[in-house]
Amino acid sequence: WKQEDLFDVANTIANQMNFEITNNNVVNTVTNFKGSYAGRLSVTKDIDTIKTISNPSIDNSSVYNYETKKYTKIYDYDKLKSLDKYDIYLSGASSIIDIVNPTSNSNRELIVFRDSYGSSLVPLLIEGYKKITVVDIRYVSSRILNNYIKFKDQDVLFMYSILTINNSFS
């Protein structure tokens, strides 16, 4: 789920959900690294690359994390020091976050139910929404979601890897 390879996916979702993604994106190479399993494998030459996508909507949006009660940017560059460099996207796995886009021309809201694979795709959808609530039901019971989300007229997107769906108990 490399972000720079997800433009077609993001555009397909945008088309189905009736909004457009402009093409004013800039691809930034953030880091080169060996993946988290590199130390356990005999592979020594393969370098992975993390790239982020910038545009005015992404750059001006903020992420509120209900667990930490803190705001961050879409890309958390401090996570590049962690074991899982892919946590740069939306600060990694969290039960519930809100993404607020102050530059949106729309009042639309989106609720995304996702696993960690959605972290790199969700930022590409920011342009179409004023607010995106991202829920990872691996970390929060669906029974208490109405304590955090007022379900009314939002678009909803379910985005899970097949492993998460096949092994889910929630």
Question: Model segments located where?
Answer:
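Extracellular glycan-modifying ectodomains
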Residues: 1-170
